[in-house]
């Protein structure tokens, strides 16, 4: 289920083009994710000092936090080439073999959405990661034979938003595992100011902070909002972005200070107005909103739950007191015992 809202974390074609121009090249320019940055700096320096390829790296976390950017930074720090592909693109074992045999010593192969590799392709990847060798079948039928091809030492970087879907044998072959966390408002403010400087956008610190507060902890959303606020400022404010201009632009975009858009607010309002705050089943909620169940489960709910506006219980979804306060309402009922027995209504 894709999320094409302005506050959606999924990448659009415009995001990909814009990211290329503002993507940091070095760890020193990679803002946020301090523990990850410090660890990778040590691992990279150690590998370069030994003259070895860096251990294979698994990067996981929600979309839009910089997994692809970090892979580019790692390759730049190592001073090697980066080959980019994704799990769904590698359909056959031969596709992977072609990628691996074209690598130079110590090159980095980046596989996005690595959890979507087929089992057949994974089987080829195991000896490549462990022994830098692949087995290829030549011919068909009785004449078929297996040949072993040696590979140069390389680093595989796998990225995924769903680490739980990785098979255990694949996960265990990564020597370095990094989880990317959501960014603080302060970190996002620095990212917005850096992007504004690169794109020659006149943006004050307060204006950047106003954008960062609505970015849902995600740099991709922050940069997308910056581009839309730039458009507004260009037409309405002579190209200058300050706090007031950013607020006016966000009002036009219907993105509130919590980073909620119209669909987020409509879900909470429907739960409160029509279902007394819950608990309510997902099918009933989807019908009331005229939205698909998958859209609510995969696109809308995760951020509301993460921010404490919504909880999932065995009996259904419930709006929290924080949700009532956000809508300017007084909670109608005291918090319910989420573990209470459901009465038997026969």
Swiss-Prot record:
Q: Where is this region: Head domain (RuvB-H)?
A: 257-346
* Annotated region described as Large ATPase domain (RuvB-L), given as residue ranges: 2-183
The residues listed in the UniProt record as binding Mg(2+), with positions renumbered to this chain, are 68
Which region ranges are annotated with the description Small ATPAse domain (RuvB-S)?
Answer: 184-254
Question: Which GO terms fall under biological process for this protein?
Answer: DNA recombination; DNA repair
The UniProt record gives the binding positions of ATP as 22-23, 64, 67-69, 130-132, 173, 183, 220
**Enzyme Commission numbers on file:** 3.6.4.-
Q: Could you tell me the superkingdom of the organism this chain comes from?
A: Bacteria
Q: What's one GO-annotated cellular component?
A: cytoplasm
Q: Which family does it belong to?
A: Belongs to the RuvB family.
Please give the name of this protein. Holliday junction branch migration complex subunit RuvB
Source organism (scientific name): Stenotrophomonas maltophilia (strain R551-3)
Instruction: List the top taxonomic levels of the source.
Output: Bacteria, Pseudomonadati, Pseudomonadota, Gammaproteobacteria, Lysobacterales
């Amino acid at each position: 289920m894709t999320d094409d809202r302005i506050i959606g974390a999924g990448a659009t074609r415009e995001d990909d083009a814009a990211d290329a121009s503002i993507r940091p090249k070095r760890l020193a320019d990679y803002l946020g994710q301090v523990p990850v940055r410090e660890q990778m700096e040590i691992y990279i320096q150690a590998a370069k000092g030994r003259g070895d390829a860096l251990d294979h790296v698994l990067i996981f976390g929600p979309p839009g936090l910089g997994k692809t950017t970090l892979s580019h930074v790692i390759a730049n720090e190592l001073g090697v080439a980066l080959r980019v592909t994704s799990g769904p693109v590698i359909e056959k074992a031969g596709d992977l073999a072609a990628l691996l045999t074209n690598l130079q010593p110590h090159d980095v192969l980046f596989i996005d959405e690595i959890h979507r590799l087929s089992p057949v392709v994974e089987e080829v990847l195991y000896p490549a990661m462990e022994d830098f060798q692949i087995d290829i079948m030549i011919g068909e039928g009785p004449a078929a034979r297996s040949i072993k091809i040696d590979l140069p030492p390389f680093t595989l970087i796998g990225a995924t938003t769903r680490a739980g879907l990785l098979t255990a044998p694949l996960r265990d072959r990564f020597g370095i595992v990094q989880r990317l966390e959501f960014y603080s408002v302060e970190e996002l403010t620095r990212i917005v100011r850096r992007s504004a400087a690169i794109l020659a956008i006149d943006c004050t610190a307060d204006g950047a902070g106003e954008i960062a507060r609505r970015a849902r902890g995600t740099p991709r959303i922050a940069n997308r909002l910056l581009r839309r606020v730039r458009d507004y400022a260009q037409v309405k404010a002579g190209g200058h972005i300050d706090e007031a201009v950013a607020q006016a632009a966000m009002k036009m975009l219907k993105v509130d200070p919590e980073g909620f858009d119209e669909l987020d607010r409509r879900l909470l309002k429907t739960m409160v107005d029509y279902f007394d705050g819950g608990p309510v089943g997902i099918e009933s909620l989807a019908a009331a909103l005229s939205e698909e169940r998958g859209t609510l489960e995969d696109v809308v709910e995760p951020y509301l739950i993460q921010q404490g506006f919504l909880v999932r219980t065995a009996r259904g979804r419930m709006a929290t007191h924080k949700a009532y306060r956000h809508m300017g309402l007084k909670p109608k009922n005291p918090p319910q015992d989420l573990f209470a027995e459901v009465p038997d209504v026969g």
